[in-house]
Amino acid sequence: MSQQYEKKVERTEVVYGGDRRVEGSASASAEKTTNYTHTEIRAPMVNPLPPIISTGAAGLAQEIVGEGFTASATRISGAAATTQVLESQASREQAFKDQEKYSREQAAIARAHDKDLEKKTEEYRKTAEAEAEKIRKELEKQHARDVEFRKDLVESAIDRQKREVDLEAKYAKKELEHERELAMNALEQSKMATNVQVQMDTAAGTTVSGGTTVSEHTEVHDGKEKKSLGEKIKSLF
């Protein structure tokens, strides 16, 4: 029994495409991708027969199903192309302008930084000079205070020496006065003894008297070593 088959072809195609250009570059690329699905189906053609009563398994159902069907499906993808494009004059000019603009902006940033650095340096210099001037004035004041302090020390030492000299001279004068009084007392005592003796002699006239002449001498010792005024003044220096 010959069978006839019906062939059906289904094709689905999807196309992706795009064009990309790099700014400032000397090349451009274009890419196109095509995907499609191809399906072939062969199914047996059914020729309905007149109704036949049959008890077997063969029949219309076997013709439809029993022989089965054949199908093939294939998915194909791919195809990409890259095209090199030369840089145009406008693109080169734009790239040159961008490079010049970049150089100008970079130089402006450097100038701004140098100006800011110069300003901060000047402010720091002024502050440092002001602080140095303040310190210098304080040092000058301190030096003046040191000079006055040393002057006061010298004057105080000189005043002390002067007062000590005056004190020594005062007590040396008192010592001299005391020694003078002692000497005068001794002389008075010696003179009285001589006068008694003379008066005894005058009582006899030319007659040898049997009287005795008594001479008295008084020495006073106070137990201290005596120094002259000159030696005392020299000892102060």
Curated annotation (Swiss-Prot):
Low complexity bias (residue ranges): 204-215
The keyword Coiled coil appears for this protein: yes
Spans annotated as CAHS motif 2: 161-179
Chain residue ranges for the region called CAHS motif 1: 124-142
Keywords, sorted A to Z: Coiled coil, Cytoplasm, Repeat, Stress response
UniProt record, GO biological process: response to desiccation
GO cellular component terms attached to this protein's record: cytoplasm
Superkingdom, taxonomy of origin: Eukaryota
Domain comment quoted from the record: CAHS proteins contain 2 repeats of 19-mer peptides designated as CAHS-motifs that comprise each two octapeptides connected by a tripeptide.
Remaining remarks: Trehalose, a disaccharide essential for several organisms to survive drying, is detected at low levels or not at all in some tardigrade species, indicating that tardigrades possess potentially novel mechanisms for surviving desiccation involving tardigrade-specific intrinsically disordered proteins (TDPs).
Protein name per the record: Cytosolic-abundant heat soluble protein 86272
Gene behind the chain: CAHS 86272
